[in-house]
Design a protein with these regions (language model features):
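Non-catalytic linker/capping segments at the edges of enzyme domains
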Residues: 1-36, 61, 75-78, 91-97, ...
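Generic low-polarity alpha-helical segments
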Residues: 12-16, 46, 69-71
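Short, well-structured hydrophobic secondary-structure segments
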Residues: 23, 34-57, 193, 197-206
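Hydrophobic pocket/interface hotspot
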Residues: 46, 88, 171
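Hydrophobic beta-strand-centered segment that forms part of the acyl-chain substrate-binding groove
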Residues: 50-87, 112, 118-120, 202-242, ...
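Phosphate-/nucleic-acid-contacting segments
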Residues: 103
Length: 277
């Protein structure tokens, strides 16, 4: 990849409808050559569209960061070669924070829905060039960006130290010291993406759930709530991950996901899983 900026972790190719400070519609063509495009990255695409509306609304003085998503519903899968149809509606936006709802579809079929998301604003110049972002938004709203530049994020090892099928696990994640996505997220201040961490934790939660006799191999994630990022995760940081799966009630099990550095909690979420019908 010649230049990972706006490529290695950017999931909006075109903005087809834009109402300043209010709403937007856009698209992202998932490259057919990537191995997969998991639900957490679909949620990232929706959040990035909201970020474009938010940054434009305050003249690129700030940018929202992933901090709190009250509810995300997983309604279907997006596959390599699919085109995501993205939509966001802004409830409130100022220099302090943006609040929004959004969803993504494939071929008119809803695959994800985000409700009551809140992203606090931080100075945009700490993370990226305001001028480069303005130019990028103009491109997205005009002819769109070249598709197919996303090459995947590569393998990030999750080292499982303890696994109790159907109950829980403990694992460690060593955040890479360098990776192409750091040049995109973000050029001036590399941050490990919250949605990438969520994807890694969701995958391990599925490993636990598939060991439950009540869920089995067909277990799938249907909803995540109370996603909270408490601090940035930086290159070379070690994360201790805990997954705790509760009892199955009416066909649904709830898992608590958390990541710590030392004794400090940096991320948490609640994941609901059920057996595929």
């Amino acid at each position: 990849m010649s230049d990972p900026h706006f490529a290695a972790y950017s999931f909006v190719d075109r903005i087809t409808e834009f109402h300043a400070g209010k709403r937007a519609r856009g698209a992202f063509a998932i490259p057919p050559h990537v191995a997969a495009f998991p639900p957490a990255l679909v949620a990232e695409a929706v959040g990035q569209l909201a970020a474009w509306v938010a940054m434009d609304a305050i003249d690129f003085r700030g940018r929202p960061v992933a901090a709190l998503a009250t509810e995300t519903r997983f309604e279907g899968d997006a596959k390599p070669g699919d085109t995501l149809e993205l939509a966001v509606d802004i409830e409130q936006c100022d220099d302090e924070a943006v609040a929004y709802d959004g969803h993504a579809s494939v071929g008119g079929r809803r695959v994800i829905e985000l409700a009551d998301c809140l992203g606090p604003m931080l100075p945009v110049a700490d993370f990226d060039s305001p001028d480069a972002l303005r130019e990028r938004l103009s491109l997205l709203r005009a002819e769109g960006a070249p598709a197919g530049r996303f090459a995947g994020v590569g393998d990030i090892a999750v080292n499982v130290n303890r696994l109790t099928p159907g109950s829980g696990l403990h694992a460690t994640i060593d955040v890479p010291s360098a990776a192409p996505f750091f040049a995109d997220h973000f050029p001036r201040r590399p941050v490990f993406p919250a949605t990438l961490l969520l994807d890694l934790m969701m995958r391990r939660a599925l490993d636990v759930a598939r060991g439950s006799p009540a869920l089995g191999e067909s277990a799938r994630a249907v909803r995540v709530t109370h996603v909270k990022m408490r601090s940035f995760i930086v290159p070379s940081q070690r994360l201790d991950v805990e997954i705790a799966l509760g009892a199955v009630d009416d066909g649904v099990a709830k898992a608590m996901l958390s990541a710590k550095t030392g004794e400090r909690l940096v991320a948490s979420a609640r994941l609901e899983l059920m057996a595929e019908a």
